Amino acid sequence: MTETPALEPLAPLELEPLPDEPLESDPRHSPDTDWSPWSAPLALLGGLVLAATAGLVVDLPALAFGVKLTSSHTPAGLVIADTFVQDVAFVVAAYYCARMGHRVVRAWQFGLRPPGVGWRSAAMMIGLLLLGFIMLDAAWSEIVHPSKEKLLETLGTKESTALLIFSAALTCIVAPICEEFLFRGYIFTALRNWHGTLLAAILTGLVFGGVHATSAPAADLLPLALLGFGLCLLYRYTGSLYPGMLAHALNNSIAFASLAGWSWVGAIPLIIGAPASILLLVAACNRAGFFTSPTGLSRSAA
């Protein structure tokens, strides 16, 4: 009788291990992550390099089409386009650094979630931060008498209504969202893994002020650094990036209206409209499931 040969055991399937799912931390404080503190300067440098590179992508075609661009003068429309590209580059750099090492990235890790302390408490903190900053800035101006900022002239707000609208949207909506995403959402969060909240807030504030050296008078950099410090604490103790975006938008709206010479009545639409636009954008993203889906910001890689 012929014996049936024994079947060889099947080799075990070697499945690629799934990336570790980050666990959401206490929502009453800004998220705890495993982002290396040394990746914070990398994110900033990457954002600046990416912004410069992307700026060339915008500027070179403009030159090819006959736009007059010199070292001393850049057309207002091109300044707006370059600044928009810079803001987007900040977001891309922060997200890329968070993804290094094939990490899973979730929206809550960038503070894209409702304030864990509640909106009422968050609103009070926003009010206190802005009141303190306005008083400090007024006192500082009386001491140093800084020169008037020429940002609006650079953006061409007096050249046309369209440039005025685009400038206001860029300054009061786009910039607060993108800058908070990089500086508070990533840099501050990564630096907290080095020596804690206080030093991380100080360093982030200094970097935040320094980045504005090309658009603000030198005398304004210290108040901006202190505002950056305060925004870090606001993020840390509300658990959400949204209050910082709103505070940033309110501050920029007030500054924009002041530089434009508007009355308080004339400034109300911008002061209300900019934060409202951010809230509507957040609501739209949440409704689309971008911030709340199980795969969060990494759904394309899941």
What is each PLM-predicted segment?
Residues 1-114, 142, 253-302:
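N-terminal, membrane-interfacial amphipathic/helix-forming hydrophobic leader that caps
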Residues 56-60, 202-205, 211, 216-274:
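Functionally important transmembrane alpha-helices
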Residues 44-54, 86, 121-135, 227, ...:
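Hydrophobic alpha-helical membrane-insertion segments
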Residues 41-45, 80, 119-127, 165, ...:
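Hydrophobic alpha-helical transmembrane segments
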Residues 178-203, 233-240:
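Membrane-interface helix/loop boundary segments of multi-pass membrane proteins
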Residues 90-102, 174-193:
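Transmembrane alpha-helical segments in integral membrane proteins
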Residues 86-90, 167-171, 223-231, 273-277:
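Hydrophobic core segments of transmembrane alpha-helices in multi-pass, intramembrane catalytic enzymes
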